[in-house]
């Protein structure tokens, strides 16, 4: 079992319950899911790029990604409805906690010129979204086998009702917010 999950159950719940004066432990915000999305627009010309993106996302998450398809045709981008243009993974449960632990302790500190993550990336309902410019910050990706450096979007969905609660939840996990 992931250390962060035990830490959440044993200490974070009580800490946030007293901080926000909740009457029940079920009101305490928790991380519901983590979604990883990798848009591969260049997959229109070279199908192998999408296969490599799927392999990268599989290595990072430990789960096979879903290939996302274009919802509608856009002539300006030369895409038609149904074309594969990316891949995504939704992590829940044990895999989510393990990924979250690796993200905080290993991957985020390896970001080049890292000065902290913006606290303004909350959506108004306590969910946090961040972009990673290069997938090579994850230790599962072998630098020598990378065909192209590509980024990905990471969305942390919580049960928090407000940004303040969501930020407090991530802050107790030592999420590296910019001061």
UniProtKB/Swiss-Prot annotation:
Pfam families: Ribosomal_L5, Ribosomal_L5_C. One of its GO terms (biological process) is translation. Disulfide bonds: none annotated. PANTHER family: 60S RIBOSOMAL PROTEIN L11-RELATED. This is one of the proteins that bind and probably mediate the attachment of the 5S RNA into the large ribosomal subunit, where it forms part of the central protuberance. In the 70S ribosome it contacts protein S13 of the 30S subunit (bridge B1b), connecting the 2 subunits; this bridge is implicated in subunit movement. Contacts the P site tRNA; the 5S rRNA and some of its associated proteins might help stabilize positioning of ribosome-bound tRNAs. Belongs to the universal ribosomal protein uL5 family. It comes from the Bacteria. Signal peptide: none annotated. Part of the 50S ribosomal subunit; part of the 5S rRNA/L5/L18/L25 subcomplex. Contacts the 5S rRNA and the P site tRNA. Forms a bridge to the 30S subunit in the 70S ribosome. It comes from Haemophilus ducreyi (strain 35000HP / ATCC 700724). GO terms for cellular component: ribonucleoprotein complex; ribosome. This is Large ribosomal subunit protein uL5. Keywords: Ribonucleoprotein, Ribosomal protein, RNA-binding, rRNA-binding, tRNA-binding. Gene3D superfamilies: 3.30.1440.10. One of its GO terms (molecular function) is rRNA binding.
């Amino acid at each position: 079992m992931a250390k962060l999950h035990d830490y959440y159950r044993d200490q974070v719940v009580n800490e946030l319950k007293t901080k926000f004066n909740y009457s029940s432990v079920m009101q305490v915000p928790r991380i519901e899911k983590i979604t990883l999305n990798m848009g591969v627009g260049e997959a229109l010309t070279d199908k192998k790029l999408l296969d490599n993106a799927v392999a990268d996302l599989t290595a990072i998450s430990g789960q096979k990604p879903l290939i996302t398809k274009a919802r509608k045709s856009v002539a300006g981008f030369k895409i038609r409805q149904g074309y594969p243009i990316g891949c995504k993974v939704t992590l829940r449960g044990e895999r989510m906690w393990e990924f979250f632990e690796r993200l905080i302790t290993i991957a985020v500190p390896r970001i080049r010129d890292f000065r902290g993550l913006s606290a303004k990336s909350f959506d108004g309902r306590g969910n946090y979204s961040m972009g990673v410019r290069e997938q090579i910050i994850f230790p599962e990706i072998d630098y020598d086998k990378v065909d192209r450096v590509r980024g990905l979007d990471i969305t942390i969905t919580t049960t928090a009702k407000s940004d303040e609660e969501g930020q407090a939840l991530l802050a107790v996990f030592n999420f590296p917010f910019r001061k």
